[in-house]
Structures are given as structure tokens and as C-alpha cells.
């Protein structure tokens, strides 16, 4: 056997060539990427900053370095470039309320999701993480019956029972004189309701002394971390391999989010085990017990996938509805004219406040509906833009006497914040005006907090039921020093809280109060 050894004079040129290749190839790739993105890309002709078209680092700066505020930067870009803007190398953003239903079309037109965004949540197999249109439709069909209007109306006793607990806590705070943190209380209310419906039991956060905001806070922390994970998806796999104790030290946001996921996994695993052993209450209709009885594939019913669905159902059913309740409550308490008109309508519709409320009756009350809709509009539900991809359809957008043809496969997005503050649709858009919905019922088409089309929020009916029932139960028996009803049991007073506490100042996917805010607080008097 012989051993071949390159002479030094032969090896040196090879090493030089290898070193040159290591330098030249990245430069060539960089030049190619620059030329392609700026001049050859199918969306190169769309308006927008060249830096955003050239590199994702532009978005990274506004997502991570300059706080999560790319949502607001996009709004400024539209003022500069017009209603259609290229906001990164691959994505087009549109700010035109009349085009919303085209992008977010019904299930008859294919709409996929973009993995560059969905991967940041770590729930790739959930409904919100499912990329393909057809697979999403199958998975959604298994869940839809449990969120229909009929199913939600059957849940009213669950909502009423939890609202009764919350009103009992109001009496406790009236006796102690301590400020009540309504944002925490509402998050506890919505969380107890959705967990009970999803898993058959809740964490009873309403009965915790501080309303146990841990779940809500963990989701908000996860939203903050999501911006980093969007740009560096490999971090998710790496962080998941770390124990929670270490993760909490390295990244409190990801640690809290990981612990939340662990808790949901246990809930789903317990349900799966009970189902396999037939050791559960068959008289109670809960979401995940029913899914296990559905015709979904074995994988779609596996614990590995269902915990992701569980996290999304509980998170979406907790945060967005609670925030809409908080926004509505603040503006009703802060505006005597609105409170007076609302209480007059509620007293006429509910002569005896001790009797159970009727959701059907409440849904027909025009001013209460206006209060609910304004709360939803100004809470926005999702602060981040929503993405869709039309895989086999060229969308045509017309603006300023120009026609823009958007190629199939292009990620498209719109943002509810921009739609809800479009002054052409909602004049004086930053003012809480329930009467705008009374005077123009056609405005409903522009209320996009829960999305539209085949991928709209699955829990919209449950959210509205909670909004109607909670606001009606609260303001039927509580007023303020200025506005009181004949059957009131007490008054509420805003405590060191202003409209500035409700302004969304950063994009953490879901709305969040400013960091220096002490929360939506009231004092209760009886």
C-alpha cells in the first residue's frame, strides 16, 4: 500500500484556490441576490423602499432592534408610496379596505399560508400553522361544529356561571377598597371559559387572588420572542432542547412560553389517555374529547399535533376577547353619554336583572351591538399583519389609474389596524363611537379584527357571545357616580387609567398595553 502525499508546491495553489472560492462564491451569491431581488423578481416593479426589497434585515431592524414596530412602519410606508407596497424581498402589503375580501376569500378560492411567518409560533401543525389550503379545510371542518352559533348558544350557562364568579369578585374588591385590575380579570374570565370548553376543566383563574395572569403574560412574552424566531427559525429547535429552568434564565420570554406549552401538552395527553380508557364524562361536550371521536386521521388526532391545536384555541380564546372587553369597558366608563344610553337600552330589554340573560335578545340591541363592535374595532384582536398566498390565481389590484398584477405564489398581507383607522371608512377613527354602527350596519364588512374568509378566526361566535353577555351583565347593574340605574348594585370608577393605557405601541402579534402602563384598573363601590 502506498501513501500519496501532495508536495508543498502542489498543495499551496489548491489552498489558494479554496480560499479564493470561499471569498468569491459568497460575493457572487450576494451580487446575484441583489440583482434578482431589485431587478428580476416578479414583484420588483412594486413600489417600496429598495432596502426592504433587497434584504430581510430591514424588517429585522424594526421587528427586533427598534422594538416590535414594523406594523407602524408599514403604515408610514403606505403614506409615502401609496396603497400597495413591497415590504420585504417576497411580500406585498396592501392598505385598501375594499380589497380585503379579495385577499381573504372564502374557502372556494385557495389561500395558503407562508411558512416564513407561521414558523415563528412553534405550532406548525395547528390550524394557524397549516400551510396548505386543502389540509387546512379538513382540519377546520373537524373543529367548526363546536364553534357554530348553535353550539356557542348552548354554552351560555358556562359563560353565565363564570360571569357570576367575576361579579362576586367585584363585591370582594368593593369591601377591600383595593383597585381591581380589569385586564387581568377579563383574561381570567375568558381563559376559564375556553379551557373548560376545550378540556372539560379550567385553572379557575377567576378565583385566584390576583386573577392569575400567568397564561396571558406567557402568551404575550411568546409574541415578543416570535419576531426573533421568524428571522432565526433554527433557534426554536435549539431552545426546545433546553430544560425550562435553563431556558427561563437565558430568555424569560421563551421560558414562560415553553412552560405554557408544557402545561397544554399535559392537558391534551390526559384527555387522550382518558379517551383511550373510556374514563371520561360522555355527557359533557368538550372540544378535544369530540375531536378524538372525529374522522380525522390518526396523526391529526395524535397528542403531538393536538397540543398545538389546544394552545391556539386557548390563547386565541383568552387574549383577544379579554382585550376587546377591556377597551369597551374603559370607553363606556369614560364617556357618560355612552354609559347612559347603554344602560337605558339594557334596562328596557332586561326588566329584571336577577333573571338569566338571553343572548338572542342581546344580539338584537342596536346600541349594545355598537359598543361591542367599537370595542372589537379599537382592540384590533391581532396587531400583526395577516398573510395569505394565492397559489394558482393572479390577483389584480387597481389604484391611481394603474393596474397591479400580483403573481401567483406571492405572499400578501393586510393589517387590521390600518383598515380600522382608514378615515374614509371610519371618520374620526380613533374615537369610540358606538352610534356609527347603529347608523350604518353595512360597516360590518370593514370590521376585520377576526379576519375574513375560509381562514377567519374559528372562535368568532364564542368571542361575540362573551362580549355581549359580559358587557350586558356588568352594565345592567353597575354605573358610575355620574350615571346610575334604578337597579344598580354599585358603581365603578377608573383608577389611574387613561386612554393612553389602551394605545398599542408595539407589535407583539396580539395587542398589549404600553410597558409603563399599570393596567386597566377600577375601584368598585357598593
Curated annotation (Swiss-Prot):
Biotechnological exploitation: Fusaproliferin shows cytotoxicity against pancreatic cancer cell lines and provides a new chemical scaffold that can be further developed to obtain more potent synthetic agents against pancreatic cancer. Fusaproliferin and its analogs show also anti-inflammatory activity and can be hit compounds for the treatment of inflammation-associated diseases.
The organism's place on the tree of life at top rank: Eukaryota
Pathway: Secondary metabolite biosynthesis; terpenoid biosynthesis
Alphabetical UniProt keywords: Heme, Iron, Membrane, Metal-binding, Monooxygenase, Oxidoreductase, Transmembrane, Transmembrane helix
Cofactor(s) the record lists: heme
MF GO annotations: heme binding; iron ion binding; monooxygenase activity; oxidoreductase activity, acting on paired donors, with incorporation or reduction of molecular oxygen
Pfam families: p450 (PF00067)
Gene3D superfamilies for the chain: Cytochrome P450
InterPro entries: Cyt_P450 (IPR001128), Cyt_P450_CS (IPR017972), Cyt_P450_E_grp-I (IPR002401), Cyt_P450_sf (IPR036396), Cytochrome_P450_monoxygenase (IPR050121)
Effects seen without this gene: Leads to complete loss of terpestacin and fusaproliferin production and accumulates preterpestacin IIa, IIb and IIc.
CDD domains the UniProt entry points to: CYP58-like
Gene Ontology CC: one annotated term: membrane
Sequence positions that bind heme: 457
Transmembrane helix among keywords: yes
Bilayer topology term: Multi-pass membrane protein
E.C. code: 1.-.-.-
UniProt keyword annotation of Electron transport present: no
Subcellular location: Membrane
Broad class of the protein's primary localization: membrane
Transmembrane segments: 13-33, 312-332
Role according to the record: Cytochrome P450 monooxygenase; part of the gene cluster that mediates the biosynthesis of the mycotoxin fusaproliferin (FUP) that belongs to the class of bicyclic sesterterpenoids. The FUP biosynthetic pathway starts with the enzyme encoded by FUP1 that combines a C-terminal prenyltransferase domain responsible for the synthesis of geranylgeranyl diphosphate with the N-terminal terpene cyclase domain, to yield preterpestacin I.
Protein family: Belongs to the cytochrome P450 family.
Protein name stated in the entry: Cytochrome P450 monooxygenase FUP3
Amino acid at each position: 500500500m502506498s501513501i500519496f502525499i501532495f508536495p508543498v508546491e502542489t498543495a499551496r495553489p489548491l489552498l489558494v484556490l479554496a480560499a479564493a472560492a470561499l471569498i468569491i462564491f459568497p460575493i457572487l451569491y450576494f451580487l446575484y441576490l441583489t440583482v434578482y431581488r431589485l431587478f428580476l423578481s416578479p414583484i420588483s416593479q412594486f413600489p417600496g423602499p429598495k432596502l426592504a426589497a433587497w434584504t430581510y434585515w430591514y424588517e429585522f431592524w424594526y421587528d427586533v432592534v427598534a422594538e416590535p414596530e414594523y406594523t407602524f412602519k408599514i403604515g408610514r410606508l403606505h403614506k409615502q408610496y401609496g396603497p400597495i407596497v413591497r415590504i420585504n424581498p417576497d411580500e406585498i402589503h396592501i392598505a385598501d379596505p375594499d380589497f380585503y375580501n379579495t385577499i381573504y376569500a372564502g374557502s372556494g378560492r385557495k389561500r395558503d399560508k407562508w411558512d416564513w411567518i407561521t414558523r415563528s409560533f412553534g405550532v406548525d401543525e395547528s390550524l394557524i400553522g397549516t400551510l396548505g389550503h386543502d389540509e387546512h379545510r379538513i382540519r377546520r371542518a373537524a373543529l367548526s361544529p363546536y364553534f357554530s352559533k348553535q353550539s356557542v348558544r348552548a354554552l351560555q350557562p358556562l359563560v353565565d356561571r363564570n360571569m357570576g364568579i367575576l361579579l362576586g369578585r367585584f363585591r370582594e374588591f368593593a369591601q377591600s377598597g383595593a383597585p381591581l385590575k380589569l385586564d387581568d380579570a377579563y383574561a381570567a374570565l375568558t381563559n376559564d371559559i375556553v379551557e373548560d370548553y376545550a378540556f372539560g376543566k379550567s385553572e379557575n383563574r377567576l378565583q385566584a387572588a390576583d386573577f392569575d395572569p400567568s397564561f396571558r403574560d406567557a402568551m404575550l412574552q411568546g409574541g415578543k420572542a416570535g419576531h426573533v424566531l421568524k428571522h432565526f427559525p433554527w433557534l426554536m429547535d435549539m431552545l426546545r432542547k433546553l430544560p425550562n429552568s435553563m431556558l427561563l434564565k437565558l430568555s424569560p420570554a421563551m421560558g414562560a412560553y415553553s412552560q405554557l406549552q408544557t402545561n397544554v401538552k399535559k392537558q391534551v395527553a390526559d384527555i387522550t389517555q382518558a379517551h383511550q380508557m373510556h374514563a371520561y364524562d360522555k355527557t359533557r361536550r368538550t372540544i378535544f374529547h369530540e375531536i378524538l371521536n372525529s374522522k380525522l386521521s390518526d396523526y391529526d388526532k395524535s397528542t403531538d399535533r393536538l397540543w398545538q391545536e389546544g394552545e391556539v384555541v386557548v390563547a386565541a380564546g383568552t387574549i383577544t376577547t379579554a382585550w376587546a372587553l377591556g377597551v369597551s369597558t374603559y370607553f363606556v366608563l369614560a364617556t357618560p353619554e355612552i354609559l347612559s344610553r347603554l344602560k337605558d337600552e339594557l334596562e328596557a330589554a332586561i326588566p329584571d336583572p336577577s333573571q338569566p340573560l338571553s343572548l338572542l335578545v342581546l344580539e338584537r340591541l342596536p346600541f349594545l351591538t355598537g359598543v361591542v363592535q367599537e370595542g372589537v374595532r379599537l382592540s384590533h384582536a391581532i396587531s400583526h399583519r395577516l398573510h395569505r398566498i394565492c397559489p394558482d390565481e393572479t390577483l389584480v389590484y387597481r389604484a391611481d389609474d394603474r393596474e397591479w398584477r400580483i403573481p401567483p405564489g406571492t405572499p400578501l398581507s393586510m393589517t387590521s389596524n390600518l383598515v380600522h383607522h382608514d378615515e374614509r371608512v371610519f371618520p374620526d377613527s380613533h374615537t369610540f363611537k358606538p352610534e356609527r354602527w347603529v347608523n350604518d350596519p353595512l360597516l360590518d364588512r370593514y370590521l376585520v379584527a377576526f379576519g375574513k374568509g375560509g381562514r377567519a378566526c374559528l372562535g368568532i361566535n364564542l368571542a361575540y357571545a362573551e362580549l355581549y353577555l359580559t358587557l350586558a351583565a356588568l352594565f345592567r347593574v353597575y354605573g358610575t357616580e355620574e350615571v346610575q340605574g334604578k337597579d344598580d348594585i354599585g358603581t365603578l370608577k377608573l383608577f389611574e387609567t387613561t386612554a393612553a393605557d389602551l394605545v398599542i405601541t408595539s407589535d407583539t402579534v396580539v395587542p398589549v398595553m404600553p410597558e409603563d402602563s399599570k393596567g386597566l384598573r377600577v375601584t368598585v363601590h357598593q
